[in-house]
Amino acid sequence: MGKPRGLRTARKLKNHRREQRWHDKDYKKSHLGTRWKSNPFGGASHAKGIVLEKVGVEAKQPNSAIRKCVRVQLIKNGKKITAFVPRDGCLNFIEENDEVLVAGFGRKGHAVGDIPGVRFKVVKVASVSLLALYKQKKERPRS
C-alpha cells in the first residue's frame, strides 16, 4: 500500500511525515538537543583548555605508530578531552599548563582514521597558531 492520495488526506500525510522525520539521523541529531548535553564543546566549534599531560595514543591495526596527543581540561566546563597534535614535531611546542585552542577533528564528532577515541585537534598554543610555529613564521611568547 502506498501513501494516501486525494482530498482530505493532508493531515494524515503531515503527521506521517512528522513521525518519519525522527528516523533520519541528521534530523534527530539536530532536534533532540543532545549536542548541548553530550558534546564537550557544548555546541561550539572551538574551545580553550589547559594542557594536563602529553600522551601517546597507539594507532589501530594494521598501522603501527604512536600518535602524539595531549590531555586537555576545558576552561568553560572543566571536562577533560584528548586532542591530537598535528604535524611532525609540533608536540615540542606544547608544554604542560599551556593554554591551547582545540577544534573538532572532521567526521562530525567521530574519531578520525587510525586514532581511536580522539575527536579533537590542537589549533593554537598560547594564542599562537600551531601552523605558524611549525613553519617558523612566529615564535612562542616568552612567559
UniProtKB/Swiss-Prot annotation:
Cross-referenced Pfam families: Ribosom_S12_S23
Chain positions found as Hydroxyproline: P62
Keywords for the protein's UniProt record, in alphabetical order: Cytoplasm, Endoplasmic reticulum, Hydroxylation, Ribonucleoprotein, Ribosomal protein
Location of the region described as Disordered in the Swiss-Prot/TrEMBL record: 1-28
Single GO molecular function: structural constituent of ribosome
GO cellular component: cytosolic small ribosomal subunit; rough endoplasmic reticulum
PROSITE patterns: RIBOSOMAL_S12 (PS00055)
GO biological process: cytoplasmic translation
Basic residues bias: start-end ranges: 1-20
Compartments in which it is found: Cytoplasm, Cytosol; Cytoplasm; Rough endoplasmic reticulum
Alphabetized Gene3D superfamilies for the sequence: Nucleic acid-binding proteins
Database matches in InterPro entries: NA-bd_OB-fold, Ribosomal_uS12, Ribosomal_uS12_euk/arc
Assembly and oligomerization: Component of the 40S small ribosomal subunit.
UniProt similarity note: Belongs to the universal ribosomal protein uS12 family.
Record-linked NCBIfam families: PRK04211.1, uS12_E_A
UniProt-recorded name of the protein: Small ribosomal subunit protein uS12
Source species of the chain: Lumbricus rubellus
Lineage: Eukaryota, Metazoa, Spiralia, Lophotrochozoa, Annelida
